[in-house]
């Protein structure tokens, strides 16, 4: 959520930022609402002052034995008017709040301007594209013989669900454990196992609600939602709290199942394991000092990159342009892994600094040594990594002509020493 004072005092700054995001939001609607709110508060204050004076006059007249009926009648009318205006004020305040929580974050000054993914800016790349003496296959061609069962997943539930057997299941488990070990042992993250269901307030805290409800799975006759990412529960762990400055930065990591309706993805990635309604992801969340969050963003990105480097997977990093960033982000880097079967790069991690946007919504503050009162800290999040997409990248990059897949060396201890996945299926 944006700072109300920023909107009131510098509406042109917010309008310019929203224009960069191509949000289509008209700032004058807020200005009119906020002006009406101020007018109501002034009018109520004036009426209450008048009522107080009239109450004093009634008391004085009664002490003097004078008839105060007319003034008492006026007092009743004033009270009725105040009651009406108070109700209208609350309605307008609620409208202002709803308008506020529908606004996206303001892009950082370093974010390139642009309309969509075509305007994202290349930052750097690591590694080389693998070479093959055969035409590399896509993962949905290799996968079934190694345990990716799209047919049974569809039969059990529906489209965009997959059953993992044997090598595929072992590889998913190995990747998850490997990611968590690197984060906790090498980068100082604390592992957390959060609920997979959260309430509406929690979803609002990180920005999924109210704007993106259609992207979520909600339990019928309940206020609970299935989480689309562990970012949601991890960030809200400190909602309503004041975190001591000396504890910053705080770093959490979690592996969870994630659930997304993919409402806006009709026709995209209908084949394979790239875009699922249910998938495993390891998430990184950091809570930072307000003046150090962009330094923390570079750390966060490097922690995601290290995983791809250890796996020997070629990737590139792009800075998202203003029109392609997520709702809560002030700046985002995307890590895109190379998939030789598809002959393209695919996103495998997004690392974002949300500045004080989520902290303001979830009321997460810190008490700085030189501040008189607590201030909102900054929150950051990133995929470390999307497990299913990493599995896809391994299948496509390490495939052999006979359909087998070489296991990256760092994963072999997690696979019981297995170095080669042989096509034993379909199962």
Swiss-Prot record:
Superkingdom: Bacteria
Catalysed conversion reaction: tRNA(Ser) + L-serine + ATP = L-seryl-tRNA(Ser) + AMP + diphosphate + H(+); tRNA(Sec) + L-serine + ATP = L-seryl-tRNA(Sec) + AMP + diphosphate + H(+)
CDD domains named in the record: SerRS_core
Protein's UniProt keywords contain Protein biosynthesis: yes
GO cellular component, one term: cytoplasm
EC number(s) from the headed UniProt entry: 6.1.1.11
GO biological process terms, semicolon-separated: selenocysteine biosynthetic process; seryl-tRNA aminoacylation
Binding site for ATP: 260-262, 347-350
Keyword field: Aminoacyl-tRNA synthetase, ATP-binding, Cytoplasm, Ligase, Nucleotide-binding, Protein biosynthesis
Amino acids binding L-serine: 229-231, 283, 383
Pathways per UniProt: Aminoacyl-tRNA biosynthesis; selenocysteinyl-tRNA(Sec) biosynthesis; L-seryl-tRNA(Sec) from L-serine and tRNA(Sec): step 1/1
MF terms (GO), sorted A to Z: ATP binding; serine-tRNA ligase activity
Pfam families listed in its UniProt record: Seryl_tRNA_N, tRNA-synt_2b
Main enzyme class: ligase
Localisation per UniProt entry: Cytoplasm
Domain characteristics, as noted in the entry: Consists of two distinct domains, a catalytic core and a N-terminal extension that is involved in tRNA binding.
Subunit comment: Homodimer. The tRNA molecule binds across the dimer.
Function: Catalyzes the attachment of serine to tRNA(Ser). Is also able to aminoacylate tRNA(Sec) with serine, to form the misacylated tRNA L-seryl-tRNA(Sec), which will be further converted into selenocysteinyl-tRNA(Sec).
Family: Belongs to the class-II aminoacyl-tRNA synthetase family. Type-1 seryl-tRNA synthetase subfamily.
The name this protein goes by in its record: Serine--tRNA ligase
Source organism of this protein record: Oleidesulfovibrio alaskensis (strain ATCC BAA-1058 / DSM 17464 / G20)
Gene name of the encoded protein: serS
